[in-house]
Design a protein with these regions (language model features):
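Residue-level preference for short coil/turn positions at secondary-structure junctions
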Residues: 7-9, 55, 89, 108, ...
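Conserved C-terminal helix/tail region of periplasmic/extracytoplasmic solute-binding proteins
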Residues: 220, 307-328
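Pocket-lining segment of extracytoplasmic ligand-binding domains
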Residues: 157-264
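Short, solvent-exposed beta-strand edge segments and adjacent coil->beta transition regions
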Residues: 109, 226-230, 285-287
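Immediate post-signal peptide segment of exported/extracytoplasmic ligand-binding proteins
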Residues: 2-12, 101-111, 308, 313-315
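Secondary-structure end/capping motifs
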Residues: 232, 237-308
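Short helices/loops that flank or line small-molecule/ion binding pockets
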Residues: 41-60, 73, 122-123, 127-128, ...
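Short, glycine-/small- and polar/acidic-enriched structural segments
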Residues: 12-151
Length: 328
């Protein structure tokens, strides 16, 4: 694509420094027609909130569930099918070994910790537990210790806030919770996303000891490959410069292609690289597929799951949620 411009347009861009996007933020791969101003937010979760509440950036990496909810409530930005983080979700829900939790239905009538009800990890996992294992999510008390990014959400009555001054990690330790999501999604951290995380160890067993095997089988059955990070662009930017969608898509695709070479050669050895190399055994050579065609089933599944969990007030057409940069 060749963009004929007298001068490049300036865009404020907030993306995490990931192995497959770093070539963009380092300036090694340009975004055609764009003079980027990269704004580093640590953790990137803080940028989600700033984008949703203040629409602070022209381009931002954001959690897809947060985005879909915000869009349903009229957020003036739209997503591109550039999914920069992905993982499966049979693993990552940790249980106290003394709580008698042997299967998902055992969570009914009990308290489970998740940072916020709309956290993408929680949404995907609840969807799996409901659809595949018959969990009645309304019979679980979901305990949160953070705000929802999207303030308009009307939370179900079975979502409660942790007591003042108590973190999910504390509650898990003393038996106030029988289960909680690992890492930043729940019991592996404390503190506000606007002020930085304090990491906490969470040495508890997974609900599913054979999670990897279950994830492989679920993917082969459904074709759904959960995404965790997507790129959004202000509506106003695309209204004035529609070509920006393709410029961004091509830049991110080139950066990923460069990274894939190192991934398959074995040269890439970060924890993230190792995770995605393992995922290639399930999803194929490209563990981060971009584009609408390749991701349509997964996008539809997330929109459906968010609505069923009462996170969005209405159903939305995929064309209202995503711009296909390959059709611009």
């Amino acid at each position: 694509m060749v963009v004929a411009l007298a001068e490049k347009i300036k865009l404020d861009i907030a993306i995490a420094d990931l192995p497959h996007t770093a070539a963009i933020s380092r300036g090694e791969i340009p975004i055609e027609g764009v003079e980027p101003n990269f704004i580093k937010v640590v953790p990137q979760i803080g940028a989600f909130r700033r984008m949703v509440r203040q629409v602070e950036f022209d381009v931002c990496e954001i959690a897809p569930t947060t985005y879909i909810i915000a869009r349903a409530y009229g957020a003036p930005f739209v997503a591109l099918p550039i999914f920069v983080t992905r993982r499966f979700h049979h693993g990552g829900l940790l249980v106290r070994p003394d709580a008698g939790i042997k299967q998902p239905k055992d969570l009914e009538g009990r308290k489970v910790g998740v940072r916020a009800y709309s956290v993408t990890t929680g949404v995907w996992t609840r969807g799996i537990l409901i659809d595949e294992y018959g969990l009645d999510s309304s019979k679980v008390t979901w305990v949160v210790d953070d705000e929802e990014h999207v303030t308009q959400i009307q939370l179900p009555q079975n979502v409660v806030h942790a007591p003042e001054g108590r973190s999910l990690a504390d509650m898990m330790e003393d038996g106030g919770l029988v289960a909680g999501f690992e890492a930043n999604a729940g019991i592996g951290r404390s503190g506000s996303p606007t002020g930085g995380w304090k990491e906490r160890e969470a040495n508890y067993p997974d609900l599913f000891p054979n999670a990897a095997e279950l994830e492989d089988a679920w993917y082969r059955k459904t074709g759904i490959y959960p995404m965790h990070g997507t790129i959004v662009v202000k509506d106003a930017v695309l209204a004035k410069h529609p070509w920006v969608a393709r410029s961004l898509f091509e830049a991110f695709s080139r950066a990923k292609a460069k990274w894939l070479d190192t991934l398959h050669s074995g040269a890439a050895q970060t924890a993230s690289d190792k995770k995605y190399r393992a995922l290639t055994k399930i999803v194929g050579d490209d563990p981060l597929p971009y584009g609408m065609k390749q991701n349509l089933a997964t996008v539809k599944a997330l929109e459906d799951t968010a609505f069923k969990q009462k996170l969005t007030p209405k159903r939305m057409a995929i064309s209202d949620i995503f711009v296909d940069p390959e059709q611009v």
